[in-house]
Amino acid sequence: MLFSYLLATLPLLANAALTYKGADISSVFIEEKAGVAYKNLAGETQALEAILTDNGVNSIRQRVWVKNGDYDLTYNVNLAKRVAATGASIYLDLHYSDDWADPKHQTTPDGWSTDDINTLADQIYQYTLSVCNTFAEEKINVEIVSIGNEITSGLLWPLGKTPNYENIARLLHSGAWGVKDSKLATKPKILIHLDNGWDWDQQKYFYDTALGTGLLTSDDFDMIGVSYYPFYNEKATLASLKTSLTNIQTTYGKEVAVVETNWPVKCSSPEFAFPADLKDIPFSVDGQVTFLQRLADTLTATKASGFFYWEPAWTKNAGLGSSCEDNLLVDYNTNQVRSSVKAFGQV
């Protein structure tokens, strides 16, 4: 009888190893403003964050832009208040830009220096400090703060663009201390985020080089985050991701998580071949579940912290920037959540 009980609880014990089963829902206010009313699995209208947390999501990622408007500080404070009411933790993704920040775009915010690293280092410190202090004043706990978004090619260009790793390291150090010096009662985990999480060589080169300057220290940050999108490179196998995540933890002693990922329900003409160990997964709702289960298994095996599904409900942008037509966990025709959302509670 005891043996049978232990067998039955083994999956539950494995699932408990993932600290974060999250989603980035940064565009929810824009969607709601456009008239989108999300529906839960029962077909009832419900707030998106509640639908997700009811199905196992326990952390919400929010991108923060500097300029006033969509994704600005006020936008994110208001979103965080809604998220906090569900009990989910909050992860702030500071882009340090007025627009998208990624490996191809890292534009310095308007009014920030583009020709003096001393001034820019102070500006990133003061801005980060101000963001964190605003959340402290609003009595909103923050679990994670990412100092930059997909900064493989640096941040705050041109001063912080590769190959100027001394400037990159200095800017990251300043951003990190903006978090550390804040009034937040419980200090958030400080995270550095690169793309191509499956590419260990890329990860290693960035961290070895940045840390090698001596201007960024291991004590400056707590977590390493990676993006993992299987549809951008056939080399992005789960096996490669497993190797990379294992090596990151062994080499740098940091908590690691996949902070952006998703899987399509429709991908008629993918721009790139899919990885070999994922080709058997269909482009469907069931395929989304299978992908998330395999990803979760990989993360559990490597003792990674968890994953965040990027923009699962952005119905006005179903392809989410990829060559696939639809990567959402919500049907953009009906605004009803798909059954694949239940995967968060099953992994």
From Swiss-Prot:
Q: What class of enzyme is it?
A: hydrolase
Enzyme nomenclature, EC number: 3.2.1.89
Chain ranges passing through the membrane: none
Task: Enumerate the InterPro entries for this protein.
Answer: Glyco_hydro_53 (IPR011683), Glycoside_hydrolase_SF (IPR017853)
According to UniProt, the reaction catalysed is: The enzyme specifically hydrolyzes (1->4)-beta-D-galactosidic linkages in type I arabinogalactans
The record, for Pfam families, names: Glyco_hydro_53
Signal peptide coordinates: 1-16
Q: Which residues form the active site?
A: 150, 260
Q: Name one GO cellular component term.
A: extracellular region
Q: Which domain of life is it from?
A: Eukaryota
The family note in this entry says: Belongs to the glycosyl hydrolase 53 family.
Q: What does this protein do?
A: Endogalactanase involved in the degradation of plant cell wall polysaccharides, and more particularly of hairy regions of pectin.
| PANTHER family linked | ARABINOGALACTAN ENDO-BETA-1,4-GALACTANASE A
Query: What is this protein's name?
Result: Probable arabinogalactan endo-beta-1,4-galactanase A
Q: Which organism is it from?
A: Aspergillus flavus (strain ATCC 200026 / FGSC A1120 / IAM 13836 / NRRL 3357 / JCM 12722 / SRRC 167)
Q: What is the lineage of its organism?
A: Eukaryota, Fungi, Dikarya, Ascomycota, Pezizomycotina
Instruction: Tell me the name of the encoding gene.
Output: galA
